[in-house]
UniProtKB/Swiss-Prot annotation:
Protein name: Transcriptional repressor NrdR
Keywords: ATP-binding, DNA-binding, Metal-binding, Nucleotide-binding, Repressor, Transcription, Transcription regulation, Zinc, Zinc-finger
Family: Belongs to the NrdR family.
Native species: Pseudomonas syringae pv. syringae (strain B728a)
Cofactors that this protein relies on: Zn(2+)
Function summary: Negatively regulates transcription of bacterial ribonucleotide reductase nrd genes and operons by binding to NrdR-boxes.
Length: 154
């Protein structure tokens, strides 16, 4: 680490603490050349993978686009903003956990479907009807029947 006072490369860490609810590390450092002390903050750079669209094109992950799609499905449904945000955090966590630099957009779509199914089944059906391009009532009926057959449903 360069000393901001004299530019020397030799510094030592005298104290480290977690701050910002564990999201940052605060370090007190001392320059071994001039003796000045200074503070640094470290945060992890958590980059989400790029998306590979069905046509093969690539684009950066867009959290706002994801949020808008989920909000559209959840419109006029009894789901709090907090639960929606928690679902978004869970999706982003799963994407980061892949360790991949690029993922197919289908992976994101399936993660959204999983989270919406947990939040609200009506929102799930709304999203699925667009995402899976339902063509007629039978496709809706089949998906609703599949939901009803899942374990834990009455």
């Amino acid at each position: 680490m360069h000393c901001p006072f004299c530019g020397a490369n030799d510094t030592k860490v005298i104290d480290s603490r977690l701050v910002a609810e564990g999201e940052q590390v605060r370090r007190r450092r001392e320059c071994l050349a001039c003796g000045e002390r200074f503070t640094t903050f470290e945060t992890a750079e958590l980059v989400l993978p790029r998306l590979i669209k069905q046509d093969g094109s690539r684009q950066p992950f867009d959290e706002e686009k994801l949020r808008a799609g989920m909000q559209r499905a959840l419109e006029k449904r009894p789901v709090s903003v907090e639960r929606l945000e928690a679902a978004l955090v869970h999706i982003k966590h799963k994407l980061r956990a892949t360790g991949e630099r690029e993922v197919k957009s289908l992976v994101v779509g399936e993660l959204v479907m999983t989270e919406l199914q947990k939040l609200d089944e009506v929102a799930y059906i709304r999203f699925a009807s667009v995402y899976r391009r339902f063509q007629d009532l039978n496709e809706f009926r089949e998906e609703i029947d599949r939901l009803a057959r899942e374990p834990g449903k009455e």
